[in-house]
Amino acid sequence: MDSQYETKKNDPNAIMPYPESNDEHVGEVRGLGGGIMDKEPEAQEGHAKFHRLGWKRLTVVLIVEAIALGSLSLPGAFATLGMVPGVILSVGMGLICIYTAHVIGQTKLKHPEIAHYADVGRVMFGRWGYEIISFMFVLQLIFIVGSHVLTGTIMWGTITDNGNGTCSLVFGIVSAIILFLLAIPPSFAEVAILGYIDFVSICAAILITMIATGIRSSHQEGGLAAVPWSCWPKEDLSLAEGFIAVSNIVFAYSFAMCQFSFMDEMHTPSDYKKSIVALGLIEIFIYTVTGGVVYAFVGPEVQSPALLSAGPLLAKVAFGIALPVIFISGSINTVVVSRYLIERIWPNNVIRYVNTPAGWMVWLGFDFGITLIAWVIAEAIPFFSDLLAICSALFISGFSFYFPALMYFKITRNDAKSQGKKYFLDALNMLCFVIGMGILGIGTYAAIQDIMDRYDHGKVSKPYSCAPLA
């Protein structure tokens, strides 16, 4: 322990690891008054509480983070890009994201003190890197919560036929309340219990969508054989339109942003490999089958999300089945950002364990505040969905691609056991870096162009509008 404190003294930017459960200093945390509370039982209990995650539950929470209703936007991406490019991109991006998640896992094992993605910025670039990535991390997570508020609003509107004139703001408020309530459990081991419901929900919604669209198409003139799907991109495809479709596929694999946060709660972090491989293969299967099958059943007129193509009645059924995934997948982002902020503000305070009255008050306050901010942003910005696309291009390109490449070159490169393997990994990580830069540049351009097109066609709504979104 003396060497750790000497390291901190010599390097102010060093991130010191949290003490392990058998560390004699585990209880030496500060209370509300700032004094040391020697070997406090709450600290020992709290430390154990936040180290209960095994690889199976890690897989579940990664699924909650990664697989949401956005998977039903992939048939629309396939309709734009064509069946062959769609399948190649879906499988290829999935394999690349499995690898970049592996790099993130290796980085966590080499630097156990990294508790959230922002911390790796300090390891690689010092304080300025920490602050920049922290800003990206918090903003993107809050925007994702906001997107689930809007998705919930659309869902309620579809199920209730827009509530016979009910203001859509009411549906937004109801969605925000549900997101807040589901974010109350502070540990990911607890969230994983909801994750099983989440996974069954999205699988059932996808299955209903595929069956319903298949039946509708088979009953039309000419049957399934008459559906005009294509192997190749549609004619007159613009760069912006094409890259938005590519972005929908890329962003479907954007689970890396929360991987450090989840791994920090594992009791055996080295088991992460099982989780990322399992998740990656599940995602590749679901996304490729969903995108390809629904596009083949509906054709170029497929709606986004695709369950809207299932017909009025079955769209309501599918949305109802998907209700858990809309809110559980959204609430986990609130948990991640709340955990990060509390651990940043009170790194040595028993509050961060959320097992005292003061800890629970702070936790509920952060959950409520983040959900409120997400709702306000989602309702106040008329082009919020497009702004989310810009932020995703700016930030997820880093979290999933070029930051892991930089981690490899700055942290894990020397772990390669042979020169040939090192050269291969050098090339692979250069490819990841180039992909990230391409998404950053072209993706941002495509999202901005889409906003301009929507303004030109009068498709941008007003702030806090009561108009139905469904």
UniProtKB/Swiss-Prot annotation:
According to its record, how does it sit in the membrane? Multi-pass membrane protein
Stretches assigned to the Cytoplasmic side:
153-168, 212-236, 297-316, 379-386, 449-470
Region annotated Disordered sits at: 1-21
Highest taxon of source: Eukaryota
What Pfam families does the database record attribute to this sequence? Aa_trans (PF01490)
Tell me where it resides. Membrane
MF annotations from Gene Ontology: L-amino acid transmembrane transporter activity
* The keyword Membrane is assigned to this record: yes
Topological domain, Extracellular: which ranges? Answer: 1-56, 99-131, 258-275, 338-357, 408-427
User: What GO terms fall under cellular component here?
Assistant: membrane
On whether Metal-binding is a keyword of this UniProt record, the answer is no
Q: Which Gene Ontology terms describe the biological processes this protein takes part in?
A: amino acid transmembrane transport
Q: Which residues cross the membrane?
A: 57-77, 78-98, 132-152, 169-189, 191-211, 237-257, 276-296, 317-337, 358-378, 387-407, 428-448
Provide the alphabetized UniProt keywords: Amino-acid transport, Membrane, Transmembrane, Transmembrane helix, Transport
Give the Basic and acidic residues compositional bias ranges: 1-11
**Role, per record:** Required for the transport of neutral aliphatic and aromatic amino acids via the N system.
Record family assignment: Belongs to the amino acid/polyamine transporter 2 family.
| Name of the protein in its database record | N amino acid transport system protein
